[in-house]
């Protein structure tokens, strides 16, 4: 766990997550997002993606998991998150999740975090989170 005082601009934390069939199905069940682009290969082959893709918000949830569990860690409060989805993520892809301290807002005790997800060193999702560290 990292407090506001512990965090320095440029500090970062990285973890890797694998997209599996089970994770996609579990997310579809929990979120009730059963869009066939995620679940039906026959349907998905006819789309611009030419196959099934993971839910974008599933991939984004890896950022939330890293922030809430590891960096800054338990007790962190999410204030906001913006996201840009740049490329699709597919079953069996290994997602590298990176969170870096971009800016500290001392008067509020907030941090801006650069949030990035990559597959094979290509950015698939990026954005900025604002958090209150524990």
Give the positions of each predicted feature:
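Hot-dog-fold acyl-thioester-processing enzymes
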Residues: 1-76
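Intrinsic-disorder/low-complexity coil detector
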Residues: 35, 73, 87, 132-133
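Mid-chain, well-packed structural core segment of small domains
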Residues: 69-93, 97
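Short, intrinsically disordered/low-complexity patches at protein termini
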Residues: 37-38, 49, 62, 77-78, ...
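Generic structural detector for well-ordered beta-strands
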Residues: 14-18, 84, 100, 130-132
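HotDog/MaoC-like acyl-thioester-processing domains
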Residues: 2-9, 89-134
């Amino acid at each position: 766990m990292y407090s506001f005082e512990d965090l320095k601009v440029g500090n970062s934390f990285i973890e890797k997550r694998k997209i599996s069939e089970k994770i996609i199905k579990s997310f579809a069940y929990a979120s009730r997002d059963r869009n066939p682009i995620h679940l039906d290969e026959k349907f998905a082959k006819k789309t611009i993606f030419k196959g099934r893709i993971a839910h974008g918000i599933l991939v984004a949830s890896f950022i939330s998991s890293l922030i809430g569990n590891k960096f800054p860690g338990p007790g962190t409060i999410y204030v906001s998150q913006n996201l840009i989805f740049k490329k699709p993520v597919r079953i069996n892809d290994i997602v590298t999740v990176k969170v870096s301290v971009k800016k500290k807002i001392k008067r509020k005790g907030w941090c801006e975090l650069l949030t990035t997800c990559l597959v094979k060193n290509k950015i698939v999702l990026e954005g900025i989170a604002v958090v209150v560290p524990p």
